[in-house]
Design a protein with these regions (language model features):
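Metal-dependent DNA phosphodiester-chemistry modules and their immediately adjacent helices/loops
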Residues: 206, 332-360, 565-583
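Signature of the SF2 helicase/ATPase Hel1-core->accessory helical subdomain module
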Residues: 268-353
């Protein structure tokens, strides 16, 4: 998926996924592309669809006979069963092609394993195009050396937990010394929903050739961890020789605590329902977990975050920070997103109706959801809740439900949606004020910088030469006072007493009333920063005032900035309150 091939290129939510050429798979053992052909259920296109491959007839009976004969002859194999085992391991490791309504369709090895052998409480999974795309996206993340994994958000009951289970199991059950970890919104959820239902339930239905030797000391059904170790033997049993190889790999679950896996090497990690986790900041927890997936700066493990989003006061706000930090379209010089993750959203209208080929009927689903929305139009709180639980867009997934809101939650959500998801560069200019050509007391210009201390309203044309200032000798007077005014809360001390908090200096510029301006009575410039010395702050405020050509009102108990302006010849930039004789 990650490496370019001669096969089809699919664009999936910002990732360029490369499929093998039709009928070809990449053999993970030989590290070469090899032909496997394309399975056809029928020669007729309309009768070509996914049908779970069946094991040989009387499989269990034949396997029991083979097992019995192997007790006296360890080299005995049933050729039919052996061919089936080799076939299924090949497909699990390398993938599978089949014809679907006349279209050659490629399944990743993990997706094939999920469809064919990962039995749920309702039976084996159906083939669905959204799942196909999910496993493509996941495989890309697994192969990408710059990715820590993926973060998935969609509506309820879409199989997120069981897909997380097969993701955990796959590598851990076929490689040595692999460690997998699980966290959910509570310890009980990690144990009962992910470990027991998403992992152990399907695990117990697997054919024996996909089940490594595991520790059954506490019973055939693991309750606290899945250990691919030989059972500890005691007493006379210590003398019994067991020739089977143990992988010495483990899958555990832990509480939602931020440091539960701190210091642990993780090769696979699942954070289930991370948008519902209360009392724990999942964004900050990820800062701990990500280092469990790395060794000396190299990524050695992959994670899968899954959730449906709940109210912001129930963990959603922290999840939104993690989501925003996982934008695959925004990467640093090392090729990574801020979180190391890539994000994946599945809209509700792709989850409701499917044809026999696995394609969602999006128009029918949209109409269904829109009918439901229209029926709730007279109850804005109920409508907001319904939209959030069945979102068409990621913005809707983060809508506030409005249970405790006194106002129209639909209008509030639409307004929040319009501003919350705007990027920084769409809202303001960020940078610093500097003296043009380094000439002090000359022209001030604005230099844009991602690390700048000043934020200026996007509508302000910062590339123009503002500087409405009158200079007479060494004295300066602002001449744009009818349009703008500034204010600041300074600090005078470079060092504070031990244990005291160092407050930031603050400065703002305000556009006065102007009937012809869209910026009338609007704050247009912000500065909240504490430079190393107070003089640097004073100079920043001076340059800001010069750029806009306006007066500045300073807190009158901080005399340092007043003296600085007076010493520099900018006393007339200082504003006096009405009836006040001092600045």
């Amino acid at each position: 998926m990650y490496t370019k091939t001669d096969g089809e290129l699919l664009q999936l939510q910002g990732l360029s996924c490369y499929l093998p050429e039709e009928g070809m798979v990449f053999n993970n053992v030989t590290q070469e592309f090899e032909s496997r052909g394309i399975f056809r259920r029928s020669s007729l296109d309309d009768k070509q669809f996914w049908e779970r491959p069946q094991p040989p007839g009387d499989y269990l009976k034949k396997r029991q006979k083979e097992f019995t004969l192997q007790k006296s002859d360890p080299n005995h194999v049933d050729l039919e069963l052996q061919n089936y085992r080799v076939q299924e391991w090949d497909r699990r490791m390398n993938g599978f092609w089949f014809m679907n309504n006349g279209k050659p369709t490629y399944l990743t090895g993990l997706h094939y394993f999920y469809l064919t052998h990962w039995m749920l409480d309702t039976g084996y999974p159906d083939f669905r195009i959204p799942d196909l795309e999910f496993f493509y996206f996941l495989q890309y993340c697994i192969e990408d050396p710059h990715s820590l994994g993926m973060i998935e958000c969609t509506k309820r009951r879409q199989g997120k937990t069981v897909r997380a289970g097969v993701f955990l199991y796959d590598l851990t059950s076929r490689a040595k010394n692999i460690y997998g970890g699980i966290q959910s919104k509570t310890l009980e959820d990690a144990k009962n929903n992910v470990f027991a239902k998403g992992l152990i339930l399907p695990f117990k239905q697997l054919p024996d050739f996909f089940v490594p030797v595991y520790d059954t000391e506490k019973g055939q059904t693991p309750k606290s961890e899945l250990r691919f170790f030989k059972q500890n033997k005691r007493g006379k049993n210590q003398e019994i020789y067991d020739p089977r190889t143990e992988l010495e790999s483990t899958i555990t679950f832990k509480s939602s605590d931020m440091y539960a896996y701190d210091g642990t090497k993780l090769h696979r990690y699942v954070a289930d329902e991370c948008g519902k986790t209360k009392d724990i900041d999942v964004f900050e927890r990820h800062q701990v977990v990500q280092f469990c997936l790395q060794l000396d700066g190299e990524i050695i493990g992959k994670c899968l975050y899954t959730t449906t989003v709940e109210e912001m006061d129930s963990g959603g706000e922290d999840f939104q920070r993690l989501w925003e930090a996982s934008n695959q379209d925004e990467r640093n010089a090392n090729g990574r997103t801020k979180s190391g993750l890539y994000r994946y959203f599945l809209p509700a209208f792709k989850t409701l109706y499917y044809d026999k080929y696995g394609y969602p009927n999006e128009e029918k689903a949209k109409q269904y959801y829109m009918n439901e929305r229209e029926s709730l139009e007279d109850d804005s709180k109920a409508l907001a809740s319904y939209i959030r639980k069945n979102p068409f867009t990621i913005e809707e997934a983060f809508w506030k439900e409005g249970e405790t809101c006194l106002f129209d939650s639909i209008k509030i959500n639409k307004q929040l949606e319009s501003i919350t998801w705007m990027r920084e560069k769409d809202l303001f200019h960020r940078g610093d004020f500097v003296w043009k050509d380094g000439k002090r007391d000359g022209m001030v210009e604005f230099k844009q910088s991602r690390k700048g201390k000043f934020y200026i309203h996007k509508a302000i044309p910062v590339d123009l030469e503002w500087n409405d200032v009158d200079k007479k000798g060494t004295k300066f007077t602002p001449t744009n006072v009818s349009k703008f005014v500034a204010g600041c809360d300074p600090f005078d001390h470079n060092v504070v007493a031990s244990g005291s908090r160092m407050s930031n200096g603050a400065g703002y510029v305000y556009a006065k009333y102007d009937a012809n301006s869209d910026l009338s009575e609007t704050f247009i410039c912000e500065y909240i920063h504490r430079p190393q010395t107070s003089d640097i702050f004073y100079e920043d405020m001076l340059k800001m005032s010069v750029f806009f050509g306006c007066k500045i009102l300073v807190e009158n108990n901080k005399i340092g900035i007043v003296k600085y302006f007076q010493f520099r010849g900018y006393e007339k930039f200082l504003m006096k309150l009405p009836k006040s004789k001092t600045f």
